[in-house]
C-alpha cells in the first residue's frame, strides 16, 4: 500500500501540467475602449456571446470589437453594488437596495422591472440573483 501511494505521488508530480503551460491573454477593457469603469461588481455572458459588466455607473456590453454603456434608471442614488444574471433572452440587474431592472431587447435599454421594498415592505439587502432553467428570477436577501 505504501509503495503504491509513493508510485502514485511520483507519477503525479512528474507528469506535465497542461494548465500551467497554457498562455492566457488578459485585456483591460478600460484601455481597449477608452472608458472608465473601475468597480465592476457583476459580469455575465449572454447566449449571444456578449459580455455584460455592471457597476454603479451603469451596465457595459462588450463585443469583440465594440462596446456600449447603458445607464440604469435608478429610483434612488444610494447604489453601492449590482448583481446580474442572464439566461436565454432575459438579462436582469438588481441593486443591493432592491431595484430590479431588465434589459428590453426591442428598445435596447434597461427598464425598471420592480422594487423589492415596495413588494416586501422592507429594505432587505440583495445578496444574489439567479435565473433558473424555467426563466424564473430568484433573488436572495
Tell me the role of every PLM-derived stretch.
Residues 1-141:
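Carboxylate-rich, polar loop motifs that coordinate divalent cations or form catalytic acidic clusters
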Amino acid at each position: 500500500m505504501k509503495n503504491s501511494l509513493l508510485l502514485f505521488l511520483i507519477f503525479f508530480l512528474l507528469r506535465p501540467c497542461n494548465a500551467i503551460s497554457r498562455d492566457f491573454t488578459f485585456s483591460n477593457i478600460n484601455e481597449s475602449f477608452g472608458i472608465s469603469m473601475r468597480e465592476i461588481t457583476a459580469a455575465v455572458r449572454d447566449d449571444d456571446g456578449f459580455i455584460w459588466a455592471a457597476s454603479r455607473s451603469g451596465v457595459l456590453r462588450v463585443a469583440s470589437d465594440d462596446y456600449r454603456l447603458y445607464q440604469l434608471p435608478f429610483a434612488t442614488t444610494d447604489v453601492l453594488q449590482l448583481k446580474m444574471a442572464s439566461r436565454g433572452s432575459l438579462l436582469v440587474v438588481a441593486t443591493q437596495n432592491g431595484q430590479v431592472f431588465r434589459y428590453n431587447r426591442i428598445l435596447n435599454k434597461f427598464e425598471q422591472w420592480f422594487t423589492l421594498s415596495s413588494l416586501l415592505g422592507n429594505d432587505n439587502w440583495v445578496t444574489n440573483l439567479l435565473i433558473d432553467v424555467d426563466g424564473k428570477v430568484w433573488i436572495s436577501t
